[in-house]
Amino acid sequence: SIRYADMKNGERIDLGRSPSYSGRARVTSYEGMVCASNNDAAKEHEKFSNPTIVHCPDGHTVLDFGQNIAGYVKLSVKGEKGAKCRMVCGEKLDTNGNFTVENIAWKANYDTCRFQSVDFVCDGVRHDYKPKFTIMGFRYVLLLDWPEDVDAGRFSAIAVYTDMDTTFSFTSSDAMLNRIVKNTFWSVKGNFMDVPTDCPTRERAGWTGDAQLFFNTGNYMMDQRAFFRKWMRDVADCQKGNGLVYNVNPTGGKKSGLIEWISMEGSAGWGDAMVTIPYYFWKRYGDDCLIRENWQAMEKCIAYFSSRMGKRNLFSLFSPKRSKYD
C-alpha cells in the first residue's frame, strides 16, 4: 500500500500491506466550489524500455533511458520480506560519471532526503509497480540497495503530459537544428502536465512569466487551446481582490514560497499574463473566448497596475510613492 505520496518528492510503498479503511481521516473544511476540469486529460505517452545499465565509478548502479522526460518509471521488483530499497530519478551524471541531483535539488543527499524518489518495503513476492501520485523529471535512475540483480527488461520510463495534438513538424539537413527542434518539443511535453511549469523537477510551478514567454512557441507546436482555457481559469480564480495576479498559479497564497517570491508578487512580466495570454490566444487561434471569459479579471489587473503608477507612468511594485524614478 502507499504509505506516503507527494507530487514532487515521490512515494513510499509497503508491498506487504494492503489498503484499508480502518484508519481515521481528518475532517477539514473547504470553502471553494468544486467543478470539473475543462482541460484535456493528462495521459501516458512515449515509453522507453530496456535502459542502459551504468556502473558508476562510486559503485552505484544507474539506469540510463537515453531521453530526459517528465513522467515515471514502471518496474518489476522482488525482495525478501522487510527488505528496503530506493529508486531516485535525476537528469544527469556529474563530471566523474556519477549520479547527481545537485542541479535540481537544494538538498542533494539522496540517501536521506526525499526528492524524486520511490522507497519500497518488500514482502518476498514479485510486484509490478508504477507511481499513482507523482511524476518526475529524469533521464537517469539510481538504484539503492536493490534487492535483486538488475535486469533492464524489468524497467521502462513513461512520459506523462496533457494530451495535446501536434500541429508542427520540421526536418532539415542540419542535425543540430533538428535536435534543437526535438528538444523544444520535449520542453513542451515535460512542462505541460495540466499546468504550464518552469521545470518538471525542482519548482514545478505555474509561473506566469514562463507561460507567457513560451506561449507562442508552444501553441505553434501543439494545440493548447483547452490547456490554456483551463489554466487561465486557475489564474483568474487565484487573483486577489485588488487585482494583483500571483506570479505562480495555482498559488498557495501569501504563506507559501520564499520571501523573495512573496515580495515580488504581481510583478510586471509575470502578473500581466492575465492580459497578454488572452491576447496571444486570440492572435493564434482567432478565438476571443479567453478575452470574454476573463474580461473582468483583465480589467482588475489593469486597475491594479494603474494604481501602482507614479507621475511618469512607470510601474512600481510596492507603491508609487516609493518609486525612485519619479
Briefly describe each language-model feature range.
Residues 216-245:
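N-terminal hydrophobic signal/anchor transmembrane helix of membrane proteins
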Residues 178-181, 185, 225-236, 275, ...:
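Hydrophobic core segments within long, regular secondary-structure runs in both alpha-
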Residues 202-210, 223, 265-273, 293:
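Aromatic- and histidine-enriched alpha-helix N-cap/loop-to-helix transition segments
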Residues 250-257, 262-286:
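Charged, long alpha-helical assembly modules
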Residues 146, 213-224, 274-290:
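Well-ordered alpha-helical scaffold segments within catalytic/enzyme domains
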Residues 1-201, 210, 226-229, 245-262, ...:
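Extracellular/oxidizing-compartment recognition motifs
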